[in-house]
Amino acid sequence: MKMKAKWLPIAAGVTAALASQAAFAVDFHGYFRSGVGVSTDGSMQTGLSDNAKQKVGRLGNEADTYGEIQLGSEVFNKDGKTFYVDSMVAMTSNGSNDWESTESKFQCTSANGTALDGCENKEDATFALRQFNVQAKGLLGFAPEATLWAGKRYYQRHDVHISDFYYWNISGRGAGIEGIQAGPGKVSFAWVRNDRSGTNVDGTYNDEMNVNTLDLRYAGIPLWQDGSLEVGVDYAIANPSDAQKDSANAQYKNAKDGVMLTAELTQGILGGFNKTVLQYGTEGYSKTFAFWGDRSWYGAEAKDGADGFRIINHGVIPMGNSWEMGHQLVYGVGNDMWDTNDKWETMSVVARPMYKWDDFNKTIFEGGYFKDKNKSTNGTSEEDAGYKLTLAQAWSAGSSFWARPEIRVFASYLAQDKKEMKGNAFNNGTADDTWNFGVQAEAWW
């Protein structure tokens, strides 16, 4: 009897917890990728270019461990009014050790333990709070279907999966009204803070400058069978402090507001989709298009009068019963972004065909090519270019292109065609090509 009495409080606690769980259900979502790999010179090398995987594809070109854990719950539901609390924590690391923490580790130190010049602070892992927000429905009499939200959140992100390229993404801390029915489509409005860490053209760093973005979108406009349109405008407000305005730093004194226009046409094809995106921007948005920005940052330091545009085509299309193809085409331009810059062009082509052997076994190919060109005001030009070829064998929970979890064994070859700006990209600056071999798992739920 004593043993039974001893366990009664524990049993009661477990019962209460289970009852609470049933009454207060928690939605559990997440994403992760991780694995192991080597190159012909040590660990995997993915530095073909800045934003390399966005330019030549991510398959066999990711050396990190990255994960997101999302927990959310509807905490109130009465008379057609609901409140939902959402949260997400993310972690990233290079995956080099078993125990990975945020402890600071300098790559090289002096005898007394201080960092020497030229040494980097190497943290094993970085953790971040990505989302924490409240979303409420049924509160607005003029639009009961709309969502009123505030906090930190992923906000209507548009991306190309095969390259992990986000081209329309103002995620951050903010507030807004989402999904107001207006004619055939829905209107959303948001105010989000996207501060700019001050980066001069010469590479020095300064205090962050406050930047606020106003985002207006009209989505779900039907055009024809399986065709729809989304349009939007983003207005970035550069908001330097009085001290920054009075400083000698020209990037703060001359920072200008910018406007970005986006139109995205979506067409359903054979059970897949194709998207064509047109974007135009002024001032700091010129850097967004030249340097593969997603709009979560605004290049406030750009020279007065800068502008740019970007054209994107991407999608995933079935080709018969056994093949599916993912693709990306990107062309971006930034004009007059700093005193010596006339025009910066970037282009990318990525294709990922996949053959399904059965419901769980597939072979994947991925090829990507990019070219960057910087034309100066004196008429001279510099170019970087390169490519990646990947072959992978994969096992996944289903035959679809999107089936996950998935485990892949891969081999990738990366090489530079031109290296006038970057120089040799591999083997500590001594080689212009490399091989990567590895195994990676990816999952979302």
Curated annotation (Swiss-Prot):
The record marks 31, 66, 99, 273, 402, 444 as: Greasy slide, important in sugar transport. Induction: By maltose. GO terms for biological process: monoatomic ion transport. The keyword Transmembrane applies. One of its GO terms (cellular component) is cell outer membrane. The record marks 166 as: Important in sugar transport. Keywords: Cell outer membrane, Ion transport, Membrane, Porin, Signal, Sugar transport, Transmembrane, Transmembrane beta strand, Transport. It comes from the Bacteria. InterPro entries: G_neg_Bact_CarbUptk_Porin (IPR050286), Maltoporin (IPR023738), Porin_LamB (IPR003192), Porin_LamB_sf (IPR036998). PANTHER family: CRYPTIC OUTER MEMBRANE PORIN BGLH-RELATED. This is Maltoporin. It comes from Aeromonas salmonicida.
